[in-house]
């Protein structure tokens, strides 16, 4: 609190004060300076709370105490210090120093309170006060414990007092005799080193040199309008020293400090950088993002930029100006002429340089494009010549393909004759070379042709060893093909078709009896498999990729089987047996591979379709065959003896399975021996016997079937 300003109260001057020695004056100055620092610190802390009502009440109490102290001073009593009271032991502390007695009451009031005719520069009223703080000190305890630094405590300096006066901690009567500026202080800040830049509030605002010169700084402080609350000093209980408290003393943190970087100035700077600095930087901030923050651009005022200046072209040899020469000269590389223009140069050396440059540019110049005429012109040669050239080229191509194919066959196949389909192609080619005839387009009805096929020319599994007497009513061959795949047709009726890979696909050859035979094989260079076989006698066969018969045709009809060999369809030709009770024939379409397809519409409407590279070739192989005596043809010709034997074996197998089931049901007793076959097996046996009598099979085969289906007794 600031001292009460006004008219100084009259009183007697104490002229009997003793002169203190120099040692006591020095201690008092140091203690006063320490007290000033401590009080400023406490004032800063309590100023934040902003309790104005308590400040006014405290102000009134302090003024009353000051008035009472001023009255006691007038009685001529000596300066007395405040006795310290130890809270832990409850004993008053011993006094150490005394206030100097060189200043009486009147001199103090002259120095503190302004009056008429007061001259602050007068040396008469300039007391020797060092580091005096605001006189509004109080002994009241602070309302709460704030986070203030832990300072080293010292015993207060007790001053002499009158007999019978109580201690300062228990009563405030000892403070009524003297102004608060002369009271002793509890804290000592001399042992604490605090940075002045970090904590400006802990240091005095008035410099030491100003305080020692005059008392004008006291007047400026007292003239402030805002009254600051400074609590009284209270002696706190000293806690036992521990390692944690000792570490806490080194951390001097001001809670009002807005910047968190104050931790860097402390003893544990390295620990702060490693543990806290990175996390503190990531704290969220208020405001625009950092990318939008203002960044001061660096100034380049010290750099002097010169304007670009165009140099005048000058000759390197003689130094003359070349602007007029370059204005007339065409330096573009696109307009280079064979004979460049001659320019008047300034000197001979420059002229030689230009000539050399022109020669080099002519050397590296690309040749000019030669344009051809695109106007219409007459064709080269006649149409006949162009057609002959195409036929000749096609013939050479086919010869090369056939030569390559025969070379592969002769290399892979042995010359010995075997009964398989591999030697059949070679034998057929030999027949083509030996026998030749004119192409047959039509023959008169009634002519009997006997087709005899030797065993060496066909595989044994084809079963073409018997002779057939048939009458050829019409033999007609139709051929349509393109030139984009291998095709060759000679005068004797030989036809060759090759796959796009060059392998032989279809070959059609004439035979000895004015007929033909056609073979279709797969697309492989070595050991090709036969896919289909057709002849003019009316017998044809097509095969699955696994070798089983797919479609079989004879002069009476045909049958259709699956890959497992199971018969799916059977039919007879309508021309051979019109009165038959069997269903009429339905067309059959087969795809032997990706290039060849078979179409069977009627006996005389059988064709092969070859499709490759977008072109198609069709070969008609249908033959109309008529029998002389149709009544001699046995009924149900489509059922052979082998088929009937298979049915008999099937009935026998089912009967054995039935007995095996009985053994499993009655394993101990022999009742299964007395069990008869199921009724459905007996019915199948009767039907098979009737079928055998109607089919006209041989007697030997009939006896074998009866033995198979006969139930053992």
Swiss-Prot record:
> Per its UniProt entry, which superkingdom is the organism in?
Eukaryota
User: Chief localization class?
Assistant: nucleus
Annotated signal sequence is none
User: Where are stretches of biased composition, namely Basic and acidic residues?
Assistant: 18-43
What does the UniProt entry say about where the protein is found? Nucleus
* Keyword Nucleotide-binding recorded: no
SS bond list:
none
In this chain, composition skew of type Low complexity spans 165-174
- List where Acidic residues composition bias occurs: 44-61
Q: Write the record's keywords in alphabetical order, separated by commas.
A: Nucleus
Keyword ATP-binding applies: no
The record's listing under Pfam families reads: FAM194 (PF14977)
Compositional bias (Basic residues)? 1-17
Stretch list, region Disordered: 1-177
Question: Where are the compositionally biased (Polar residues) regions?
Answer: 133-150
Any single Gene Ontology cellular-component annotation: nucleus
Q: Which PANTHER family match?
A: GLUTAMATE-RICH PROTEIN 6, SIMILAR TO CHROMOSOME 3 OPEN READING FRAME 20
Q: Which family does it belong to?
A: Belongs to the ERICH6 family.
What is this protein's name?
Answer: Glutamate-rich protein 6
Specify the species. Mus musculus (Mouse)
Lineage of this protein's species? Eukaryota, Metazoa, Chordata, Craniata, Vertebrata
């Amino acid at each position: 609190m600031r001292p009460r300003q006004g008219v100084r109260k009259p009183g007697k001057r104490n002229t009997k004060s003793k002169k203190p020695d120099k040692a006591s004056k020095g201690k008092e100055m140091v203690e006063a300076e320490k007290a000033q620092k401590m009080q400023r610190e406490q004032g800063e802390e309590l100023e934040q709370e902003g309790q104005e009502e308590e400040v006014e009440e405290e102000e009134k109490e302090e003024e009353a105490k000051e008035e009472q102290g001023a009255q006691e001073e007038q009685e001529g009593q000596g300066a007395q210090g405040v006795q310290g009271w130890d809270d832990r032991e409850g004993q008053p502390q011993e006094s150490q120093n005394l206030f100097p007695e060189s200043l009486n009451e009147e001199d103090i009031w002259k120095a503190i309170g302004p009056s008429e005719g007061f001259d602050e520069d007068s040396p008469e009223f300039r007391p020797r006060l060092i580091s005096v703080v605001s006189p509004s000190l109080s002994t009241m305890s602070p309302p709460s414990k704030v986070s203030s630094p832990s300072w080293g405590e010292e015993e207060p300096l007790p001053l002499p007092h009158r007999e019978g006066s109580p201690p300062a901690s228990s009563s405030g009567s000892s403070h009524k005799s003297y102004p608060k500026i002369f009271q002793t202080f509890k804290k000592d800040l001399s042992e604490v080193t605090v940075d002045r830049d970090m904590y400006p509030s802990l240091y005095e605002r008035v410099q030491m040199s100003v305080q020692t010169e005059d008392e004008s700084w006291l007047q400026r402080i007292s003239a402030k309008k805002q009254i600051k609350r400074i609590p009284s000093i209270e002696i706190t209980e000293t806690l036992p020293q521990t390692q944690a408290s000792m570490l806490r003393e080194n951390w001097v943190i001001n809670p009002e400090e807005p910047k968190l970087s104050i931790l860097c100035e402390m003893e544990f700077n390295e620990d702060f950088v490693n543990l806290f600095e990175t996390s503190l930087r990531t704290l969220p901030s208020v405001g625009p993002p950092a990318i939008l923050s203002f960044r001061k651009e660096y100034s380049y005022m010290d750099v002097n930029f010169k304007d670009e200046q165009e140099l005048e072209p000058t000759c390197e040899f003689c130094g003359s100006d070349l602007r007029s020469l370059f204005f007339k000269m065409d330096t573009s590389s696109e307009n280079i002429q064979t004979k460049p223009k001659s320019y008047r140069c300034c000197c001979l050396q420059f002229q030689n340089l230009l000539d050399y440059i022109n020669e080099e540019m002519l050397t590296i110049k690309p040749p000019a494009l030669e344009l051809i005429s695109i106007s219409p012109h007459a064709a080269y040669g006649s149409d006949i010549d162009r057609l002959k050239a195409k036929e000749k080229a096609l013939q050479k191509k086919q010869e090369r393909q056939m030569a390559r194919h025969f070379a592969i066959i002769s290399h892979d196949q042995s010359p010995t004759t075997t009964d398989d389909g591999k030697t059949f192609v070679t034998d057929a080619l030999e027949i083509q070379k030996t026998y030749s005839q004119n192409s047959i387009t039509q023959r008169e009805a009634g002519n009997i042709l006997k087709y005899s096929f030797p065993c060496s020319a066909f595989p044994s599994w084809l079963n073409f060893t018997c002779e057939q007497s048939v009458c050829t009513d019409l033999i007609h061959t139709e051929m349509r093909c393109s030139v984009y795949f291998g095709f060759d047709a000679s005068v004797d009726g030989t036809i060759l078709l090759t796959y796009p890979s060059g392998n032989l696909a279809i070959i059609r050859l004439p035979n000895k009896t004015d007929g033909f035979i056609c073979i279709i094989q797969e697309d492989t260079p070595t050991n090709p498999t036969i896919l289909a076989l057709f002849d003019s006698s009316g017998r044809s066969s097509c095969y699955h990729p696994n070798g089983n018969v797919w479609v079989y045709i004879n002069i009476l009809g045909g049958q259709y089987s699956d890959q497992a060999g199971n018969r799916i369809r059977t039919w007879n030709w309508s021309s051979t047996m019109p009165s038959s009770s069997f269903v009429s024939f339905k067309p059959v379409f087969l795809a032997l591979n990706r290039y060849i397809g078979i179409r069977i519409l009627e006996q005389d409407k059988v064709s092969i379709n070859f499709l490759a590279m977008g072109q198609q070739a069709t070969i008609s192989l249908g033959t109309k065959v008529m029998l002389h005596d149709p009544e001699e043809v046995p009924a149900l010709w489509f059922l052979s003896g082998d088929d009937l034997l298979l049915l008999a074996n099937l009935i026998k197998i089912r009967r054995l399975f039935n007995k095996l089931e009985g053994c499993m049901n009655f394993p101990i007793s022999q009742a299964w021996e007395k069990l008869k076959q199921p009724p459905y097996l007996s019915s199948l046996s009767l039907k098979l016997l009737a079928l055998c009598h109607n089919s006209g099979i041989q007697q030997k085969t009939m006896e074998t079937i009866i033995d198979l289906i006969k139930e053992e007794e």
